[in-house]
């Protein structure tokens, strides 16, 4: 909304800064960060009054995990509401309100946040341990993929890119035409991203910290893709209006930083499915809009590893009756092997940073 102030720069020159994406991106990050700081304690107090405490998985299933995390029982969850609120308000202040890519990303995030809230509500308020069914979550993620696909394919400006799969690090074979397979592929991306972040959200600060690096990578790619000069030089497709996603990603970065203030060990609040499903969906949708879906595998390497560990664990147990890991997702494996929770979290943050740098290096290594 503040973007329109630059039209009055003739009266007050400094207002011209509101035209620049970089300035508005910094403003969005700071705004969402401050909003999380200010709203964090009231939100946590409200969740405590509602008795929205997180039940600890493992008391009946994995006794060792229950022993490690038993003290967390009753910690308020659904803290993802804080992230959703901060991102939404920040973006409404700093993003051009007519930008279709912003609305597509934000509405997808809010929709999956609503599904996550429903799941958390059933778990912590209605005391139904398993929440909503996995089929409902998958259906919701499929709906996001289909809607995003229809919007992009119906628009002549984005239709061609939406049907092409961009290969990172390759200059000669940088696109593969997937045609009508685009929508099924988008569904897979949203499902994979949303569930991977959800699986990663098992330790204090882990998912939020890893999200910061991934969102930064896509903030950079959004900025470059939205500029004809820079995108041409770096062999990225030019997408008119994509620069506003830089602001969306920056708001997400700020919100995750602010949330970490309360979510770092020992956590005063958990994001729950309200936050993890929403964040994963948002990252997936941004990747789809930019045509950088495969880059998400690199930038979100920790999310991929966590999800893969669960898949391998289930497959191994069903095929051989043996488990590959002490427990899945992988962060619990290291906990049960003797690593402290903070050690696992910080080491995974470091790896996430390295994955982010590797993803950014694809801009020049071609």
Curated annotation (Swiss-Prot):
Recorded E.C. number(s)?
2.7.8.13
Any one GO cellular component localisation term in the record: plasma membrane
Supply one GO molecular-function term: phospho-N-acetylmuramoyl-pentapeptide-transferase activity
| Transmembrane parts of this sequence | 27-47, 76-96, 101-121, 136-156, 176-196, 205-225, 241-261, 264-284, 285-305, 343-363
Q: Which CDD domains match?
A: GT_MraY (cd06852)
One Gene Ontology biological process: cell wall organization
Q: Which cofactor does it need?
A: Mg(2+)
Q: Does the keyword Cell membrane apply?
A: yes
Q: Where in the cell is it found?
A: Cell inner membrane
- Name the PROSITE patterns on file: MRAY_1, MRAY_2
Catalysed reaction(s) here are: UDP-N-acetyl-alpha-D-muramoyl-L-alanyl-gamma-D-glutamyl-meso-2,6-diaminopimeloyl-D-alanyl-D-alanine + di-trans,octa-cis-undecaprenyl phosphate = di-trans,octa-cis-undecaprenyl diphospho-N-acetyl-alpha-D-muramoyl-L-alanyl-D-glutamyl-meso-2,6-diaminopimeloyl-D-alanyl-D-alanine + UMP
Q: In which pathway does it act?
A: Cell wall biogenesis; peptidoglycan biosynthesis
Question: What topology in the membrane does the UniProt record assign?
Answer: Multi-pass membrane protein
User: Per the similarity annotation, which family is this?
Assistant: Belongs to the glycosyltransferase 4 family. MraY subfamily.
Annotated function? Catalyzes the initial step of the lipid cycle reactions in the biosynthesis of the cell wall peptidoglycan: transfers peptidoglycan precursor phospho-MurNAc-pentapeptide from UDP-MurNAc-pentapeptide onto the lipid carrier undecaprenyl phosphate, yielding undecaprenyl-pyrophosphoryl-MurNAc-pentapeptide, known as lipid I.
Q: What is this protein called?
A: Phospho-N-acetylmuramoyl-pentapeptide-transferase
Organism lineage string: Bacteria, Pseudomonadati, Verrucomicrobiota, Methylacidiphilae, Methylacidiphilales
